[in-house]
Amino acid sequence: MIGYDIVRVFCGPDGDHGDRIAVVRDGSAVTGEQDRVAFARRSGLTATVFVDDPERGVIDIRSADRRLPFAGAPCLGAAWLLDAPELITPAGVVGVRLDGEFTWLEARPAWAPPRTLRQYDSPEEVDALPVPPPGEWVYAWAWEDEGAGRVRARGFPGRGHGAEEVEATGSAALLLADRLHRALNTSQGRGSQVLTAPARDGLVELGGRVHLDRAVPGASAATRPAITLGSPASSRRRIHLLDL
């Protein structure tokens, strides 16, 4: 069994929720293209990050079916875990900073995968949306408080299989901040929080809370003890790690 960590990215103020990402710190343990795809698929998580050079911050991001040149939550999770000042991705160099309870990165909107940003009249309308049919990746959003830059959002990947809705997504929030040219505080899913703000030279800052619990290599899901996610602010939710 290969060691890996699970992080929750874009946690809410209580330390709960967030997007679950797997991080393999020793990327040399999974080098083959098909092996990485299979590992990411078996994880059952949004994405898996393989750290190919921890000193330089070189990472490789995989979803269940493809390589991702850049993705917000995986980059934030890996940066927080490695305490890295920057990450090197296929899309480019991602600047990183830690600011108290939040981890921030700077990225170019052009790096983000395409998303359909669909505005609705109210948060209640967003909350009442059914899952759209398979097709385009839809980021549904509405103003909670336009003056304060507060947004309510949900993310629908549009896949015919797998996740119908993601708890939190950084790339779509980054694209929305770029479109609106302003800082945003977004509540997504059941209670995740995503922060964005325009930055220098056309970059956009993306920030959120990251919580960690480390997996135990070699134990199966049937025998591995439950683990507790989060920092002292967390709500002590318990999960079982996946058997990879």
For the regions a language model picked out, list residue spans one by one.
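Active-site proximal loop and beta-alpha junction motif in alpha/beta enzyme cores
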Residues: 1-244
